[in-house]
């Protein structure tokens, strides 16, 4: 329970950082990793069972690759690092299992809890494009191309000067649009006029759905996957 509370505090701090500046300080995820290794090492010591510390180390390694895969898909590097932190901190948690995935999730060395947190966070994020679209419609944004129609669900249109102040990432203009921006490459606004309107990333970080998922996954487990499978008759 202590490690769950530490994880909740870490994700809350990360969410605040990400909402304010879209940058997550490294000390957040590093602290989660260090505490996780020490805490699980302590559990192994007092129980004379190496399973806890092994699960923590394996959880960190598996979640490193999961975080890297998320980064390749365009998710911020800070989000992936937080998943690494969860892998070391709380690789396993007594969550309810509602689907046949239970046999896989219950595998001894699989960091099932962080993986389930990411999966549920993806489901929670499904509603975000609808919110972004409605916000654009209310603002009177009118798409001119097929890609701009997609951007209505994925980004916001604003003046370059405003985007710079809000530290957004560039999606582009109607002539050249990129739907998956890179935090390293798509932050140079010098090629645009400051009064020009362009498409940029919305101010809805993925850390927030991760934080929400973290709190709820301990209660619902893989229930959302169960609902999804039942809808499609699987």
UniProtKB/Swiss-Prot annotation:
Chief location of this protein within or outside the cell = membrane
One GO CC annotation:
plasma membrane
Q: Which residues lie on this side of the membrane: Extracellular?
A: 19-23, 73-78, 140-205
What Gene Ontology terms for biological process does this UniProt record contain? proteolysis
GO MF assignments:
aspartic-type endopeptidase activity
Q: Name which cysteines form disulfide bonds.
A: none
Query: Which Enzyme Commission number(s) are on file for it?
Result: 3.4.23.52
Presence of keyword Cell membrane? yes
EC category name: hydrolase
| Catalysed reaction, written as an equation | Cleaves the signal peptide of 3 to 12 amino acids from the N-terminal of preflagellin, usually at Arg-Gly-|- or Lys-Gly-|-, to release flagellin
Q: Which residues form a coiled coil?
A: none
Q: Where located?
A: Cell membrane
Membrane topology, as annotated: Multi-pass membrane protein
Taken from the record's topology, the Cytoplasmic segments are 1, 47-49, 90-110, 218-234
Q: Please name the InterPro entries in this protein's record.
A: Arch_preflagellin_pept (IPR054964), Preflagellin_Peptidase (IPR052218), Prepilin_IV_endopep_pep (IPR000045)
Q: Where is this site: Essential for catalysis?
A: 18, 79
Which positions, given as ranges, span the membrane?
Answer: 2-18, 24-46, 50-72, 79-89, 111-139, 206-217
What are the alphabetically sorted keywords of the record? Answer: Archaeal flagellum biogenesis, Cell membrane, Hydrolase, Membrane, Protease, Transmembrane, Transmembrane helix
Similarity-based family: Belongs to the peptidase A24 family. Archaeal preflagellin peptidase subfamily.
Q: What does this protein do?
A: Cleaves the N-terminal leader peptide from preflagellins.
- Please give the name of this protein: Preflagellin peptidase
Q: What is the protein's species of origin?
A: Methanocaldococcus jannaschii (strain ATCC 43067 / DSM 2661 / JAL-1 / JCM 10045 / NBRC 100440) (Methanococcus jannaschii)
Q: What is the lineage of its organism?
A: Archaea, Methanobacteriati, Methanobacteriota, Methanomada group, Methanococci
């Amino acid at each position: 329970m202590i490690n769950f509370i530490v994880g909740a505090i870490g994700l809350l701090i990360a969410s605040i950082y990400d909402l304010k500046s879209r940058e997550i300080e490294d000390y957040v995820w590093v602290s989660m990793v260090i505490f996780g290794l020490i805490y699980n090492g302590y559990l192994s010591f007092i129980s004379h069972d190496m399973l806890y510390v092994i699960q923590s180390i394996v959880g960190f390694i598996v979640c490193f690759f999961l975080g890297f895969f998320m980064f390749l898909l365009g998710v911020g590097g800070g989000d992936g690092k937080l998943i690494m932190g969860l892998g070391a901190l709380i690789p396993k948690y007594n969550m309810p299992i509602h689907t046949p995935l239970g046999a896989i999730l219950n595998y001894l060395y699989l960091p099932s809890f962080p993986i389930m947190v990411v999966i549920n966070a993806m489901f929670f994020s499904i509603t975000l494009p609808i919110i972004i679209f409605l916000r654009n419609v209310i603002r009177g944004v009118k798409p001119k191309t097929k890609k701009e129609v997609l951007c209505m669900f994925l980004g916001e249109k604003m003046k370059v000067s405003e985007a710079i102040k809000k530290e957004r990432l560039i999606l582009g203009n109607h002539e050249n649009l990129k739907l998956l921006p890179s935090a390293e490459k798509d932050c140079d606004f010098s090629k645009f006029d400051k009064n020009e309107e362009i498409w940029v990333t919305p101010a809805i970080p993925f850390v927030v759905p991760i934080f929400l998922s973290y709190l709820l996954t301990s209660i619902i487990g893989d229930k959302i996957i169960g609902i999804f499978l039942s809808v499609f008759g699987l």
